Swiss-Prot record:
UniProt lineage: Eukaryota, Viridiplantae, Streptophyta, Embryophyta, Tracheophyta
Domain of life: Eukaryota
InterPro entries: CemA
Regions that span the bilayer: 7-27, 106-126, 145-165, 181-201
Protein name from the UniProt record: Potassium/proton antiporter CemA
Function according to Swiss-Prot or TrEMBL: Contributes to K(+)/H(+) antiport activity by supporting proton efflux to control proton extrusion and homeostasis in chloroplasts in a light-dependent manner to modulate photosynthesis. Prevents excessive induction of non-photochemical quenching (NPQ) under continuous-light conditions. Indirectly promotes efficient inorganic carbon uptake into chloroplasts.
UniProt GO MF annotations: antiporter activity; proton transmembrane transporter activity
The entry's keywords: Antiport, Chloroplast, Hydrogen ion transport, Ion transport, Membrane, Plastid, Plastid inner membrane, Potassium, Potassium transport, Transmembrane, Transmembrane helix, Transport
A matching Pfam family: CemA
Coiled-coil portions: none
Catalytic reaction annotation: K(+)(in) + H(+)(out) = K(+)(out) + H(+)(in)
Chief location bin: plastid
GO CC terms in record: chloroplast inner membrane
Subcellular location(s) per record: Plastid, Chloroplast inner membrane
Organism from which the protein derives: Hordeum vulgare (Barley)
Length: 230
């Protein structure tokens, strides 16, 4: 009876896993036009912020210096420069457009991900019964295994998430999250996350093995330590 109930629960879990991709692609198309209109209206109504003005000014000075250097190299520099060359003006306009596009994509990705998380949370809440059935079936399946296979699976999971090569995997995960939300990469945050999160997770797993698993099956803990120390 439990196995019959577990199949719909398993299908529901697959639906929840695939849901974010479907929602993301659908809402990206729906929200893109609306956010573009909102962003362009906002940009026309509110002038540039102090940060944007500072960045544009820095970019303008950089381009002007490069242009003057180029003129000096060519020997065409005049003693008095009345106005910046038209090339700089075009470069600044192009840079502002690219900057606006970047901001637009950040808002679009962030909005889509927030909607995905809200729908995903609602799906977990509404499908609580199916997930409880699936959880009980997985626990029953796990407890019916012999201690050696249990220890093997526990060791496989722990090594996969907190093993020697897991740091590279966690780095890819945090980079993927940043790219998915449209945020600019931050190497400092990546380093802190990779150095701290696996350690915290490893501590939690050790706590579970020593205090929780030891009460359920002491022989399993002995086998687990024998395999891990081999």
């Amino acid at each position: 009876m439990k196995k019959k109930k577990a199949l719909p629960s398993l299908l529901y879990l697959v639906f929840i896993v695939l849901l974010p991709w479907g929602v993301s692609s659908s809402f990206n198309k729906c929200l893109e036009l609306w956010i573009k209109n909102w962003w362009n209206t906002r940009q026309s109504e509110t002038l540039l912020t102090d940060i944007q003005e500072k960045r544009i000014l820095e970019r303008f000075i950089e381009l002007e210096e490069l242009s003057l250097l180029d003129e000096m190299i060519k020997g065409k520099l005049k003693t008095h420069v009345q106005k910046p060359p038209t090339g700089i003006h075009k470069e600044i306009i192009q840079w502002v457009k690219i900057n606006n596009e970047d901001h637009l994509h950040i808002i679009l990705h962030f909005s889509t991900n927030i909607i995905c998380l809200a729908i995903l949370s609602g799906s977990f809440f509404l499908g609580k019964e199916e997930l409880v059935i699936l959880n009980s079936w997985v626990q029953e399946f796990f407890y019916n295994l012999n201690d050696s296979i249990k220890a093997f699976f526990i060791l496989l999971v722990t090594d996969f998430f907190v093993g020697f090569h897991s740091t590279r995997g966690w780095e890819l995960v945090i980079r993927w999250v940043y790219n998915d939300f449209g945020w600019a990469p931050n190497e400092l945050i990546f380093t802190i996350f990779v150095c701290s999160f696996p350690v915290i997770l490893d501590t939690c797993l050790k706590f579970w093995v020593f205090f929780c698993l030891n009460r359920l099956s002491p022989s399993l803990v002995v086998i687990y330590h024998s395999i891990s120390e081999a």
